[in-house]
Amino acid sequence: MSAPEEHKETPLEVIHEFINGVDDGTIRRDLGEDCILSFYSRNVRGAKAITGFLRNQLTMRYKHEGFEEAAQIEWGDELLLKARFGRSFDSERRRIYEEKERTGTTLHVRPESDDEEVNEKFSSTLITPPRPSSYNLNSLKYVEACGLLNKRNEHIYGGLDMGESCAVHLTLGYRSTFLPGGQVSGFEICLAVYDRGLTSLKRSTLIPPLCSISFARRASARCNPTTDDEEDTEEDSTPPTARRCVRRTLFTEENTQKEEDADFIPVVEQEQPAPQEQPAPQQAEETGEVVIPVDISTALKTTNFSSCTPRKRQQATNGNEVVRKRATGPRRMRF
């Protein structure tokens, strides 16, 4: 008996085998039972579910073109793929194992006899489901390629709508297997990741691009000036724009200065009359006037201010005014 033939697939052969199966609808033969599809961050698990999804959403509307180069992914990207899909692989393997356990038969053929009692023997071995591990992911080989998804000319309703053409970065994880005959080795796809917009190989599909495009802001864009605690130096601060919000407009230095100027009223110094000089005693004797010395402090204490400033001013009355007459008693009219 001859040994099985070993055939090492190139990355480009694996990519072409997969896209040909997707385009003609025969992708089921290339998928493993625990396969996972990530189509633009939408995950589909299981070979049957993936086959139905690709036939309904992709095969009838788009066709793979331009996949001329393929290469193995970098070690860093491989670690990212394992960290991203490791838990999904473990849960999918557990689901497959539980389905096989439920479908297994539990019937046993025993001789029917009323006289003999058959002692049931229980096995002492414990059957446990597979523990979470990344064994399947570690055994996979990963390849990547870039191409296009071009829309077919047929007018078919339904499925995905990604425009006339869409750039695709395709990453596949596969493992080597033996065909049913046992003489020829093959491979089965266990992971397929579609990413949009990437056109170069040897770069991660799971992290954002290193450089980002920055657009210059318009001159008329709304911008508020920084406050005193936000700006470092006066030289670095930019002049304020024409547009400002209400709060910034009310509490700017210009407006506060204007308010202070409006409230400021210049005080005009009133000319105080010159103090009158008291006549000397010699002049008083000549004029014959008697000068009585008055203490200012005692005069202020004895002066009654109510007499100076009455609470109600007395209005001057003319002689032609008539005093108002008001009826009292029963003669008073009631309304």
From Swiss-Prot:
InterPro entries: Roughex (IPR009259). Pfam families: Roughex. GO terms for cellular component: nucleus. Residues 266-285 have a biased composition (Low complexity). It comes from the Eukaryota. GO terms for biological process: mitotic cell cycle; regulation of cell cycle; regulation of exit from mitosis. Disruption phenotype: Rough eye phenotype, and/or male sterility and in, some cases, pupal death. Residues 304-320 have a biased composition (Polar residues). Residues 227-237 have a biased composition (Acidic residues). Residues 325-335 have a biased composition (Basic residues). Residues 222-291, 304-335 are annotated as: Disordered. Negative regulator of both mitosis and meiosis. Required for the establishment of the G1 phase in the developing eye. The rux phenotype is suppressed by mutations of genes involved in cell cycle progression such as CycA and string, and enhanced by mutations of intercellular signaling genes, Ras1 and Star. This is Cell cycle negative regulator roughex. It comes from Drosophila melanogaster (Fruit fly).
